[in-house]
Amino acid sequence: MARITVEDCLKRIPNRFQLTLAATYRARQLTAGGTPQIELDPHDKDKPTVIALREVAAGKVGLEMLNRGQA
């Protein structure tokens, strides 16, 4: 299992406050049954927050998470 660092995520979303919000929204989606957008190892028992951060670091999730629910 590769470790995820905040620095990896900050390369994608430079503002740490926006990063926190985007990862939180995505983690909530995953908790509610959302499908992960990255490939997961079936042996890893990563929490939704870790999966969300991995998605941000991989570029699969970004600032579009902050626009959820807005028309």
Curated annotation (Swiss-Prot):
GO CC annotations, alphabetized: DNA-directed RNA polymerase complex
The keyword Magnesium is annotated on this UniProt entry: no
InterPro entries: DNA-dir_RNA_pol_omega, Pol_omega/Rpo6/RPB6, RPB6/omega-like_sf
SMART domains: RNA_pol_Rpb6 (SM01409)
SUPFAM superfamilies: RPB6/omega subunit-like (SSF63562)
UniProt GO MF annotations: DNA binding; DNA-directed RNA polymerase activity
Listed EC numbers: 2.7.7.6
Highest taxon, organism lineage: Bacteria
Catalytic activity: RNA(n) + a ribonucleoside 5'-triphosphate = RNA(n+1) + diphosphate
Biological processes annotated in GO: DNA-templated transcription
Catalytic class of the enzyme: transferase
Pfam family for this entry, one: RNA_pol_Rpb6
Keywords of the record: DNA-directed RNA polymerase, Nucleotidyltransferase, Transcription, Transferase
Family: Belongs to the RNA polymerase subunit omega family.
PANTHER family given in the database record: DNA-DIRECTED RNA POLYMERASE SUBUNIT OMEGA
Function: Promotes RNA polymerase assembly. Latches the N- and C-terminal regions of the beta' subunit thereby facilitating its interaction with the beta and alpha subunits.
NCBIfam families: rpoZ
Subunit structure: The RNAP catalytic core consists of 2 alpha, 1 beta, 1 beta' and 1 omega subunit. When a sigma factor is associated with the core the holoenzyme is formed, which can initiate transcription.
The protein's name: DNA-directed RNA polymerase subunit omega
Originating organism: Azoarcus sp. (strain BH72)
Lineage, top ranks: Bacteria, Pseudomonadati, Pseudomonadota, Betaproteobacteria, Rhodocyclales
Designated gene of the protein: rpoZ
